[in-house]
Amino acid sequence: MTDNSKICVVVGMSGGVDSSVTALLLKEQGYDVIGVFMKNWHDTDEFGVCTATEDYKDVAAVADQIGIPYYSVNFEKEYWDRVFEYFLAEYRAGRTPNPDVMCNKEIKFKAFLDYAMTLGADYVATGHYAQVKRDENGTVHMLRGADNGKDQTYFLSQLSQEQLQKTLFPLGHLQKSEVREIAERAGLATAKKKDSTGICFIGEKNFKQFLSQYLPAQKGRMMTIDGRDMGEHAGLMYYTIGQRGGLGIGGQHGGDNQPWFVVGKDLSQNILYVGQGFYHEALMSNSLDASVIHFTREMPEEFTFECTAKFRYRQPDSHVRVHVRGDKAEVVFAEPQRAITPGQAVVFYDGKECLGGGMIDMAYKNGQPCQYI
């Protein structure tokens, strides 16, 4: 049996059941485990529910239960500078960002990893549903989590080989239901705690109210593609391509009586375009351009390959052909795709392995850019 007692693993503990079980499993496997709670957002907020103080109490309770030391570290400045400023800039540019991807890249696996090294860590571990596998050459491959419904490789797609070399994902081979069972059997304080939702680290808030604190909303016209005025929108940043709810025009129907969706934006004119039908022609595209292209292991500077891809979390994989030039890529779809959204991540897969990905800049239909920003 391997002696893990001299291997120090620092676990990012959020106060949730997943990171609690992560720490428990590593402790049971004999590792020298240290828990760390990351505080990345200020507590005093007039909207929604801020749970940082209660979450830290849960971390303390679980750490005491399983017998590990624990610390709290403040990354508020790093989060603001590296994630939140990016988040706001993307919304200003009419895009729909995915802060979780950037949060993992810059905070959980950079700022936290650096801090863990100062504690003497050999590895860091988190409660993500993903797997790492080292090949005979020592290269680490990131694989999907065994629980298809919980797999989080989409959000981890910007991690580097250097980061993956130092990372453990103890829950990767488990189903979520098994994680709950382990927590309940061990009597962990977080066993019945509900999963968190909302923006990475910021928690559950009224998104419209939250965003309006930082970006002034500019109301404008809501129109159909053919120029019919449909009323007023509350501010382009509040809408995403393919969105159905929140338009306030449910009672206005054309001849086909189908629901209305956001089908485009014109940032320069402050116009929100809407159309009827889930598969409205303006929502369909057959290629995209992406930037910030990144692979989890070494790849050539320029190459073309075929794989599957996701354009949003929990979406079924789609077959694509990818041509990479440096940190940019053209991605051509085997079948037309709906609501490809600038600012979201496109993530590439080879079977179970997550190869990496990038950020969507523009969608195209037959070579013509879709009016999505």
Swiss-Prot record:
Superkingdom to which the source organism belongs: Bacteria
Positions annotated to bind ATP: G12, M13, S14, G15, G16, V17, D18, S19, M38, G127
Site (Interaction with tRNA): H128, Q344
Example GO molecular function: tRNA binding
Uppermost EC category: transferase
Reactions catalysed according to its record: S-sulfanyl-L-cysteinyl-[protein] + uridine(34) in tRNA + AH2 + ATP = 2-thiouridine(34) in tRNA + L-cysteinyl-[protein] + A + AMP + diphosphate + H(+)
Entry's EC annotation: 2.8.1.13
Principal subcellular localisation of the protein: cytoplasm
Region ranges (Interaction with target base in tRNA): 98-100
GO annotation, cellular component aspect: cytoplasm
Localization (cell): Cytoplasm
A Pfam family reported for this protein in Swiss-Prot or TrEMBL: tRNA_Me_trans_M
InterPro entries according to UniProt: MnmA-like (IPR004506), MnmA-like_C (IPR046885), MnmA-like_central (IPR046884), MnmA-like_central_sf (IPR023382), Rossmann-like_a/b/a_fold (IPR014729)
UniProt-annotated stretches for the region Interaction with tRNA: 150-152, 312-313
Cysteine pairings via disulfide bonds: C103-C200
UniProt similarity note: Belongs to the MnmA/TRMU family.
Protein name: tRNA-specific 2-thiouridylase MnmA
Organism: Streptococcus pyogenes serotype M3 (strain ATCC BAA-595 / MGAS315)
